[in-house]
Design a protein with these regions (language model features):
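N-terminal pre-domain/capping segments
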Residues: 1-93, 119, 130, 172-175, ...
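Acidic-and-aromatic substrate-binding clefts and catalytic sites of carbohydrate-active enzymes
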Residues: 7-15, 31-44, 64-74, 103-105, ...
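Short beta-strand segments at enzyme active-site cores
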Residues: 31, 57-59, 93-101, 141-146, ...
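Short amphipathic alpha-helices and their capping/turn segments at secondary-structure boundaries
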Residues: 39-51, 80-91, 156-164, 192-206, ...
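Acidic/histidine-rich catalytic cores of soluble enzymes
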Residues: 59, 127-227, 232
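Short, electropositive alpha-helical surface patch
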Residues: 111-119, 152-165, 223-241, 261-273
Length: 273
């Protein structure tokens, strides 16, 4: 596996960017560029990543294809297609998004809504995922959906079903097990759940997010995401299972408030390896 962070360190040049990441022990990264970046700037970052042996882990396409607002949905699908094409161009491991929230304009794009589980929603997720992939037909990268606690896919079994029903070689798995820790049983049975995720999804995993969770002791159930190695999850076990995948599989830390927090959290994770 290749550890990395989603945060770009403060830098003035691509070489400085890559050098700082390497000095932290990173071997995976997120490029601080997108499809609108000038060609010469993009090439500079790509060269710096190659020289530092940094694998580009992902090109995020974070948007809401499931929006009930047609304009928002169309814009999201278009963004996903552009980002997937960019991921294909630069050879990123994957292009992740969420399936999306079934909500009108102005609603929380990644939020919990009953309609996320409506019978017709699953079919829409399959159809839009195909539409995104078929516009690009990637061969070097994959479109992926991030696991979520309150939308499709909310379990490894549902992700297996999606892989079958989308039925595209350009569709694969981005694994973020922390997002599936949505009950005390899952929290306390984390090691067994991790094993089940890797048993069902391991061959299709193209990238991983690494996060921690703490179960707080007040009513009602409150599971809070927290920096790695400060919660109750056995991240060493997660990393051991990740190390059994393709050795170039990226494992990224995310959702931390600033660069220094990433530095400190990554140091704790490296100590587990």
């Amino acid at each position: 596996m290749r550890l990395g962070i989603t945060c770009a360190p403060p830098h003035q040049t691509p070489a400085e960017w890559a050098g700082k990441l390497s000095s932290l022990g990173c071997r995976a990264c997120v490029l601080p560029c997108d499809e609108t970046t000038p060609e010469d700037v993009l090439e500079g970052y790509l060269a710096a990543a190659r020289d530092a042996d940094l694998r580009i882990a992902e090109v995020g396409a974070w948007s809401n294809p499931m929006s009930l607002d047609p304009e928002t949905s169309r814009a999201a699908i278009s963004l996903c297609q552009r980002r997937l094409a960019f991921a294909e161009r630069i050879g990123a491991a994957c292009c992740p998004n969420i399936s999306g929230a079934v909500v009108g304009a102005g609603g929380q794009w990644d939020g919990p809504f009953a309609a996320n589980y409506a019978p017709e929603t699953y079919g829409r997720v399959v159809a839009t995922t195909r539409e995104i992939i078929d516009a690009v037909n990637p061969v070097r990268t994959f479109y992926t959906l991030e696991p979520m606690p309150w939308m499709i896919p909310d379990s490894p079994e549902e992700y297996v079903r999606l892989l079958r029903d989308v039925d595209r070689p350009g569709f694969a798995v981005h694994l973020d097990i922390a997002n599936w820790i949505h009950s005390p049983r899952r929290y306390f049975g984390y090691r067994e759940f991790v094993d089940e995720c890797f048993r069902l999804l391991g061959p299709s995993v193209k990238s991983i997010h690494l996060k921690d969770v703490v179960l707080q002791g007040h009513l009602t159930t409150h599971l809070q995401e927290c920096p790695c190695c400060t919660g109750g999850l056995d991240l060493a076990h997660y990393l051991r299972r990740a190390s059994e995948l393709d050795p170039d599989t990226p494992v990224l830390l995310e959702h931390l408030p600033d660069y220094q927090a990433y530095v400190e959290s990554l140091a704790r994770v490296c100590a587990l390896c």
